[in-house]
Design a protein with these regions (language model features):
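N-terminal, membrane-interfacial amphipathic/helix-forming hydrophobic leader that caps
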Residues: 1-102, 119-123, 234-238
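N-terminal hydrophobic or amphipathic segments with adjacent small-residue motifs
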Residues: 13, 20, 26-27, 35, ...
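Helix-boundary and loop/linker segments of multi-pass membrane transporters
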Residues: 18-23, 57, 97-103, 135-143, ...
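Alpha-helical transmembrane spans of integral membrane proteins, capturing the lipid-embedded, hydrophobic core
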Residues: 30-38, 42, 69-76, 107, ...
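A broad, low-specificity signal for short, low-complexity segments enriched in glycine/proline
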Residues: 58-59, 112-116, 130-132
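Cytoplasmic juxtamembrane regions at transmembrane-helix boundaries
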Residues: 90-105, 175-187
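Transmembrane helix-loop-helix hairpins at the membrane interface
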Residues: 119-238
Length: 238
């Protein structure tokens, strides 16, 4: 007698996994989730933009802060909703599916390897093409504490949840490691193009390394920490 297929397979979704990847959604949902996250951030920022009336000039500091927070919120809410299977799973289950997990001390060696690989790539890239340039968005957020909140804390956490936890995690259920890491990194880099095209290749490599780090350590937390470190250095250099 044939066994009845799990409900997840009947619904076209990957069955829950004991090991990596932890995602219970597939590649299509992962890509769609990024689009939904961007749309959510845009919709959440509309009131601030309308009230600020940017037709009179650049957005005010308050409006810029709200837009940045709205973007981060979109990158957090949509992955969380997808990970809960639209409310079926608990908060803890959703976080674990997104890679928000503890990690072993051995993860430190992979973090150091990731930093080393990125520094080598950045050095070679700068030697060949010159130092990448990005728009200085920090000043548009006002005081230093607010800059730290948005650039060093909110951005790394929300982007790792969205691009590594949701996107890479979902792609990994259907694609080989390198391919999934590359696709997620390309999306991550492309979405930063508005702040400076020359910085896109290093950001793509950074996203690629962080995806591999996630799989090696089984947690997005090491990637969040390195992302925070990277943004801290960038903020100090501006």
């Amino acid at each position: 007698m044939e066994a009845t297929p799990p409900a997840e397979q009947l619904a076209g979704r990957p069955a829950p996994r004991a090991g990596f990847p932890y995602a219970t959604w597939g590649a299509q949902m992962a890509v769609g989730g990024v689009l939904l996250a961007l749309a959510a951030g845009f919709l959440l920022s509309i009131p601030a933009v309308v009230i600020d009336n940017p037709a009179e000039g650049d957005l005010s500091t308050a409006a810029n802060v709200v837009v940045q927070l709205a973007t981060a919120l979109g990158f957090l809410l949509v992955p969380f909703v997808i990970a809960t299977r639209w409310g079926e799973a608990s908060v803890g289950q959703a976080l674990r599916r997104l890679g928000v997990r503890g990690f072993r001390p051995a993860a430190l060696k992979w973090m150091l390897a990731a930093v080393g690989a990125y520094l080598v790539f950045a050095g070679v890239y700068s030697a060949l093409f010159g130092a990448p340039e990005q728009e200085d968005i920090a000043e548009s957020f006002g005081t230093v504490p607010v800059q730290v909140l948005l650039i060093v804390l909110a951005a790394p956490i929300s982007e790792e949840v969205c691009f590594r936890g949701m996107l890479f995690g979902g792609l990994r259920t259907r694609m080989p490691r390198i391919a999934a890491a590359l696709v997620s990194a390309l999306v991550f880099g492309a979405l930063h193009a508005l702040t400076g095209l020359s910085a896109v290749p290093p950001l793509i490599f950074f996203g690629f390394v962080l995806a591999l780090l996630y799989e090696k350590t089984g947690s997005i937390v090491p990637g969040i920490l390195l992302h925070m470190l990277n943004n801290s250095v960038a903020l100090l250099g501006q």
